[in-house]
Amino acid sequence: MLLDLNRFSFPVFLKEVRLLTTLALPMLLAQVAQVGIGFVDTVMAGGAGKEDLAAVALGSSAFATVYITFMGIMAALNPMIAQLYGAGKTDEVGETGRQGIWFGLFLGVFGMVLMWAAITPFRNWLTLSDYVEGTMAQYMLFTSLAMPAAMVHRALHAYTSSLNRPRLIMLVSFAAFVLNVPLNYIFVYGKFGMPALGGAGCGLATMAVFWFSALALWIYIAKENFFRPFGLTAKFGKPDWAVFKQIWKIGAPIGLSYFLEASAFSFIVFLIAPFGEDYVAAQQVGISLSGILYMIPQSVGSAGTVRIGFSLGRREFSRARYISGVSLVLGWMLAVITVLSLVLFRSPLVSMYNNDPAVLSIAATVLLFAGLFQPADFTQCIASYALRGYKVTKVPMFIHAAAFWGCGLLPGYLLAYRFNMGIYGFWTALIASLTIAAIALVWCLELCSREMVRSHKAV
């Protein structure tokens, strides 16, 4: 049977579901809070006007592409730390965490410079109003300053989640979400003596909450008794290029996979810009809601990575394979709920963002397409995270490259412009690309986990 789902009794299945849920739920709440920051940005910008909403859509797409790609690179720390923890190598856990912070800081500075360099080419390429382009440039400038803190936060995020302590991440994320609301209100609308920055104010608020999140999570770890034996904050460690090389070897394919998937969504915003601001605004609504729902498989997948990595560290290879299957089943059950939510409540969901009739009509149709790809999206996400627990990252990268670019973005462009399907051509191609990725990744997971069990039985 697929991933030996019939290997253990039903009580064992329920136990694994419970363990995955215990890990995934705080991660989900933390992810929802983080995506909620983007949701607040979208709502606040929409309140300032559809020009500001379009500017934030463009600017946040650029920021999200860099952030998500680099977040994928930092995700290498999860299987590294989880396997060390499972093997009982306490000192190595703390040292790997320290090197992760150094790596994240260097990566974040590079991301900041990269975003600065991208502002002028984006403005030269776009053909929108001066106000939209200027607001987008300001937004990108502010959010670029968040990149160093964002990557340090991701290192600390990986450290705490891999040690089965996701509750700290949840608490910090909710505090950041709460802080983001008044900051957006102040900066966007010009309250308490501050100038009204419009959509650019969303970027300034985002920068502030990322720095808050990194600092708060560091303080939590330093003061929590559970973390003291690992010694993350007990001493200062110099950068170790050998560890950096290991992080890069595992993380670079993950980062590229994230980029390929994110670009299939983010680049669409730029490609549909010639259709007008209504379509750009509607696309931002679809991306925002899809991003919120994507946190569900991402959280289940993250929990699966930790549980699989921990089991492999303990040399429980059959258990790791079984956990891979259980995480997929849990994801499929949750996917049914998200499909129904998007289809049945698409109109009220869209109205939370903007009341412009044209935007409402386009966005409501976009959500139908988003609902159709939920099962495939859940499957490919959780399967890729499970493979990550095995430190298998290159094959998923190639699968994502073929699926999202070969079967997604490029065909979507042809459907949109050559076959006159407009924005819906891109979403049609995305459904096909996600389905192909899901099938290929599950097949890869089946082979990889089976071979791991067989090879260690033979020893």
Swiss-Prot record:
The keyword Ion transport applies. The keyword Cell membrane applies. One of its GO terms (cellular component) is plasma membrane. One of its GO terms (biological process) is monoatomic ion transport. Coiled coil: none annotated. The chain crosses the membrane at residues 20-40, 53-73, 100-120, 132-152, 168-188, 202-222, 254-274, 286-306, 325-345, 358-378, 395-415, 423-443. GO terms for molecular function: antiporter activity; xenobiotic transmembrane transporter activity. Keywords: Antiport, Cell inner membrane, Cell membrane, Ion transport, Membrane, Transmembrane, Transmembrane helix, Transport. It is a multi-pass membrane protein. It is found in: Cell inner membrane. CDD domains: MATE_NorM_like. Pfam families: MatE (PF01554). Its main location: membrane. Belongs to the multi antimicrobial extrusion (MATE) (TC 2.A.66.1) family. NCBIfam families: matE (TIGR00797), MATE_multi_NorM (NF000263). Multidrug efflux pump. This is Probable multidrug resistance protein NorM. It comes from Neisseria meningitidis serogroup B (strain ATCC BAA-335 / MC58).
